[in-house]
């Protein structure tokens, strides 16, 4: 055993001496290689425009090359529903996930002693509309067991949490789950199609742009509530999140991603007409360019990396015991790279 220890000591001494020689002559020291392939998820529709523009214009590849990472392969996949997104991120199938603050907060809470998921940046701030074709419904208080409400994922998606917040606001915190049994999990295009068709059990949809506006063009469909009303103001709708494992092992790739999404947002704000055409091309949507531009021109629709109102979700989820850990501020669940922003 003593001989083994002595041998190990001599090897360490020789390695240290070699490093001193490298440093003395200014020779480069090999660093841990970062990933050569990045997997990014995006959801459906306008709230995910920054990621869509990143994909269309190959912005991450551009910024990775500028950061000295060489040519990297970037794979994008479309996933509907926060629970599926979370499973993919935890399994390592995704480098960057996207979704609403509630699914991210759930992961942050559950992974604190392991891979530690945190927010990378916000993506979009915009209202969601709770639309219905039931003429008997005027407010959320009128919902009954005869109604079926489409949400991204039952109990855990941003739509599901907003519905719980609406129930708590109308009937008290003890009744937060009042509408859970009325919800069905559906992706946004299918949910909107079901509502507009007038067929099937779904007669209410917690929708999102552009689908919510198309729904309101159908006679008989009207809005019960806006998420901004439920939240008491604007809030982040979509955001990006990742594991600390990926963040810590790939600092340059992480910075390249932030630079890429920042450029994508600048493109959206600078060329809304061109971005609308890209959106229609990538989604195979039949909507008019003017309709998409009108949504992008809406002052309530903002693309920004700054988190807005996310602590309201965190406070509510902790209050109903959906979170075991209470964050002190939004900076607790976002990586340090954006903590200089005026978030909330």
Residue ranges and their predicted role:
Residues 2-19:
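Bacterial N-terminal signal peptides that target proteins for export
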Residues 16-28:
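Bacterial N-terminal signal peptides
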Residues 34-176, 181-185, 199, 203-209, ...:
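Short, glycine-/small- and polar/acidic-enriched structural segments
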Residues 62, 83, 87, 91, ...:
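Solvent-exposed, polar/charged alpha-helical surfaces in well-ordered, non-transmembrane soluble domains
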Residues 69-75, 174-181, 283-295, 324-330:
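Short, surface-exposed acidic
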Residues 172, 180, 189-280:
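Pocket-lining segment of extracytoplasmic ligand-binding domains
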Residues 247-324:
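Secondary-structure end/capping motifs
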Residues 317-344:
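Conserved C-terminal helix/tail region of periplasmic/extracytoplasmic solute-binding proteins
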């Amino acid at each position: 055993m003593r001989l083994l220890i002595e041998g190990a000591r001599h090897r360490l001494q020789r390695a240290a001496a070699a490093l001193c020689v490298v440093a003395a002559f200014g020779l480069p020291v090999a660093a841990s290689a970062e990933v050569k392939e990045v997997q990014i998820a995006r959801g459906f529709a306008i709230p995910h425009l920054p990621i869509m523009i990143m994909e269309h214009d190959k912005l991450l590849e551009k910024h990775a090359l500028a950061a000295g990472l060489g040519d990297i392969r970037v794979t994008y996949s479309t996933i509907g529903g926060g629970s599926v997104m979370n499973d993919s991120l935890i399994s390592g199938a995704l480098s960057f996930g996207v979704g609403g603050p509630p699914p991210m907060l759930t992961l942050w809470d559950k992974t604190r002693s392991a891979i530690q998921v945190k927010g990378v940046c916000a993506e979009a701030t915009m209202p969601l509309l709770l639309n219905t074709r039931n003429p008997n419904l005027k407010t959320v208080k009128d919902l009954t067991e005869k109604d079926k409400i489409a949400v991204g994922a039952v109990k855990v998606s941003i739509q599901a949490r907003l519905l719980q917040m609406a129930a708590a606001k109308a009937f008290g915190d003890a009744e937060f789950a009042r509408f859970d049994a009325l919800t069905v999990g559906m992706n946004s295009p299918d949910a909107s199609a079901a509502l507009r068709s007038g067929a099937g059990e779904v007669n209410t949809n917690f929708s999102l742009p552009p689908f919510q506006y198309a729904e309101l063009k159908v006679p008989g469909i009207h809005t019960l509530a806006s998420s901004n009303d439920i939240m008491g103001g604007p809030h982040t709708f979509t955001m990006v999140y990742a594991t600390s494992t990926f963040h810590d092992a790939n600092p340059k790739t992480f910075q390249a991603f932030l630079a890429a999404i920042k450029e994508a947002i600048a493109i959206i704000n600078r060329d809304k007409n061109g971005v609308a055409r890209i959106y229609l091309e990538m989604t195979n949507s039949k909507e008019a360019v003017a309709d998409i531009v009108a949504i992008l021109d809406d002052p309530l629709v903002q693309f920004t990396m700054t988190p807005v109102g996310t602590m309201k979700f965190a406070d509510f989820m902790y209050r109903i015991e959906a979170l075991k850990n209470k964050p002190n501020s939004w900076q607790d669940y976002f990586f340090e790279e954006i903590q200089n922003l005026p978030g909330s």
